[in-house]
């Protein structure tokens, strides 16, 4: 589940983002160019690629001390990321809507804490329910729990929140839409992975290594496209769906290699 989230975001979520843009283009509401802040998105991509290459290397070396060292580095690396992001100046389309509670009670800081706490309670409750469902379902259908968690868990936990990206794309807030994905990946690939490195055996089989490789491939492809074209178009981002299908086929052994 830890490594499945970055994979899902850089494959399925990116694919759905591209499909949304192309649907709007077909409806005559926009073109296929995704108008993002190239400096911000490039930084997110470089951050993820560097972090995930380190994770892949340490995972292959299999020395416990390196796991602890990398976990500490990833925490510091994410703090560096936060510092750089806070220095970023908001683009013209980066506007925000008020909290839901503000509509009824006015703008008060206590509402921020209340809405955050309620959201956290719902997330924790949903996680307990989902884990139980995952165990029962995986056992019933006979699929490896690792493969099942890599494929299903990120969809259930990450994809609903990424609906925000779809909403922002529809509203023409392209930088917010893509940064919602790349920013989440930055968090998932550092702080969350550091927890796994510290508190699990961190022995990765070929399913997980394939997962990491495809996530990296998608991120590198997007980075190269942005680097040379200075902008992104929806059509090339459809490759995220291809990477996701490739993983399903190989992980479920629908095709023998």
Kindly label every feature range from the protein language model:
Residues 1-257:
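Hydrophobic alpha-helical segments, chiefly the membrane-spanning helices
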């Amino acid at each position: 589940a830890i490594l499945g989230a970055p994979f899902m975001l850089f494959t399925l979520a990116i694919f759905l983002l591209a499909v949304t843009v192309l649907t709007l283009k077909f409806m005559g509401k926009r073109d296929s160019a995704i108008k993002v802040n190239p400096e911000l998105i490039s930084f997110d991509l470089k951050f993820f690629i560097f972090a995930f290459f380190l994770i892949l290397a340490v995972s292959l070396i299999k020395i416990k001390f390196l796991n602890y060292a990398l976990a500490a580095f990833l925490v510091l690396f994410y703090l560096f990321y936060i510092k750089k992001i806070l220095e970023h100046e908001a683009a013209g389309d980066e506007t925000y809507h008020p909290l839901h509670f503000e509509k009824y009670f006015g703008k008060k800081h206590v509402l921020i804490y209340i809405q955050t706490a309620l959201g956290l309670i719902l997330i924790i409750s949903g996680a307990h329910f989902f884990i139980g469902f995952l165990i029962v379902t995986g056992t019933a259908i006979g699929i490896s729990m690792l493969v099942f968690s890599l494929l299903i868990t990120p969809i259930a936990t990450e994809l609903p929140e990424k609906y925000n990206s779809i909403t922002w794309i529809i509203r023409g807030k392209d930088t917010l839409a893509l940064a919602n994905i790349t920013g989440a990946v930055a968090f998932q690939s550092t702080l969350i992975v550091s927890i796994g490195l510290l508190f699990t055996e961190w022995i990765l089989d070929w399913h997980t290594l394939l997962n990491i490789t495809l996530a990296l491939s998608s991120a590198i492809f997007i980075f190269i496209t942005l680097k040379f074209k200075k902008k992104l178009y929806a059509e090339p981002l459809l490759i995220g769906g291809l990477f996701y299908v490739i993983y399903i086929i190989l992980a479920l052994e629908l095709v023998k290699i």
